[in-house]
Curated annotation (Swiss-Prot):
Pathway it works in: Amino-acid biosynthesis; L-arginine biosynthesis; N(2)-acetyl-L-ornithine from L-glutamate: step 2/4
Keyword list, A-Z: Amino-acid biosynthesis, Arginine biosynthesis, ATP-binding, Cytoplasm, Kinase, Nucleotide-binding, Transferase
HAMAP family (UniProt xref): ArgB (MF_00082)
Binding site for substrate: 60-61, 82, 188
UniProt GO MF annotations: acetylglutamate kinase activity; ATP binding
Transmembrane annotation, as ranges: none
GO cellular component: cytoplasm
EC main group: transferase
Name of protein: Acetylglutamate kinase
Keyword Cytoplasm appears in the UniProt entry: yes
Main location: cytoplasm
Species annotation: Methanothermobacter thermautotrophicus (strain ATCC 29096 / DSM 1053 / JCM 10044 / NBRC 100330 / Delta H)
C-alpha cells in the first residue's frame, strides 16, 4: 500500500512536468562515487520514461586535479578559479570529454536511456570569450595586481538548437563544460554557470543542482536548519548577509540568475541521498532547497 501511495503522490507532478525540460547538474558525490552516479543515471532515465526531458551538465574539478597530479603537473587556483594553460586545457578535455562524459553516457544507456555526449564546442553550443585577468589584492601591502587565468572562459551565448533536436528525438544530452570562442579556441568553463545558462537557453522548467550538502542551510554547520523553500529575494538577502558562502555561493548565484532568466524553479539537493532527484521532483516535501521567483 505504501508503494501505491507514493505513486499516487507522484501523479500530479508527472502530469505537471510532462514534456518539460529538466536541467540536472551532476556534481559532488554523484560524480566520484560509482554507486551514486549509477543511481543518479537511473533516476535520470526514469524522468525520461515518465515523459520529462532531462538534460545533464557535469563538472569534474577533482578528477582534473587528480589527472594533473598523475602527470606531474601541479594544479593552480586563483580564488577558486583554475589557471588553465594549454597543457592543462588538454588534460581538462581528456578528463571531461574523454572520461567523465563517456562514463555518464554509458550509465544512462545501460539503464535504458538514449544518451549522447556533447561539449560546448559541438554545433557552437556554448560560445564563450576569454575571461579578463583576475584582480587580486595583497593583504599586506594592499597592492592590486592582475593575473591571467589562461584559457578560462565566460559564456557569451547558448545555441539551444542541438539540444532541442536531441530531446525532440528522445535523446538525453550530456554536456561537458567546455566552450569555444569566435577564433575556435577551446575554453574551460564553470560547470554550475553552464548548467544555469543552458537551463535558461532551452527554457527549462527546473534547474536541479546535485551537491554534497542537504541544500541551503540557515546555519551552515547544522544540517537540521535546511531551508526547504525560498524566494530569489530572500536568498539574495542571505547571500548579502554572508550566510551563504564558500562552495555554495557560486551554486546559489547560478540558481538566482537562472530564475531571473526565466527558469521556473531551481533546486539544490544532496546527491549523496539515494534517489534524491526523484524525491525532490515527485514529493510535496522534497528533499532539498527549492528556489522560486
Amino acid at each position: 500500500m505504501k508503494t501505491v501511495n507514493i505513486l499516487v503522490e507522484a501523479l500530479p507532478y508527472i502530469k505537471k512536468f510532462h514534456r518539460k525540460k529538466i536541467m540536472i547538474k551532476y556534481g559532488g558525490h554523484a560524480m566520484i562515487d560509482e554507486a551514486a552516479m549509477d543511481s543518479t543515471a537511473r533516476d535520470t532515465v526514469l524522468l525520461k520514461y515518465v515523459g520529462m526531458e532531462p538534460v545533464v551538465v557535469h563538472g569534474g574539478g577533482p578528477e582534473i586535479s587528480r589527472a594533473m597530479n598523475k602527470m606531474g603537473k601541479e594544479p593552480k587556483f586563483i580564488e577558486g578559479l583554475r589557471v588553465t594553460d594549454e597543457e592543462t586545457m588538454e588534460i581538462v578535455k581528456m578528463v571531461l570529454v574523454g572520461k567523465i562524459n563517456t562514463s555518464i553516457v554509458s550509465k544512462i544507456c545501460y539503464h535504458g536511456g538514449r544518451a549522447i555526449g556533447l561539449s560546448g564546442k559541438d554545433s557552437n553550443l556554448l560560445l564563450a570569450r576569454k575571461r579578463a585577468p583576475h584582480v587580486v589584492r595583497d593583504d599586506e601591502t594592499g597592492e592590486r595586481r592582475e593575473i591571467d587565468l589562461g584559457l578560462v572562459g565566460e559564456i557569451e551565448s547558448v545555441d539551444p538548437g542541438i539540444i532541442n533536436m536531441l530531446t525532440d528525438n528522445n535523446y538525453i544530452p550530456v554536456i561537458s563544460p567546455i566552450g569555444v570562442d569566435r577564433d575556435a579556441n577551446t575554453l574551460n568553463l564553470n560547470a554550475d554557470t553552464v548548467a544555469g545558462e543552458v537551463a535558461a537557453g532551452i527554457g527549462a522548467e527546473k534547474l536541479i543542482v546535485l551537491t554534497d550538502v542537504p541544500g541551503i542551510l540557515e546555519d551552515p554547520s547544522d544540517p537540521d536548519t535546511l531551508i526547504r523553500r525560498i524566494s530569489v529575494d530572500e536568498l539574495s538577502d542571505l547571500v548579502k548577509s554572508g550566510i551563504v558562502e564558500g562552495g555554495m555561493l557560486p551554486k546559489t548565484l547560478t540558481c538566482i540568475q537562472a530564475i531571473n532568466d526565466g527558469v521556473s524553479s531551481a533546486h539544490i539537493i544532496d546527491g549523496r541521498v539515494e534517489h534524491s532527484l526523484l524525491l525532490e521532483i515527485f514529493t510535496k516535501k522534497g528533499i532539498g532547497t527549492m528556489i522560486t521567483e
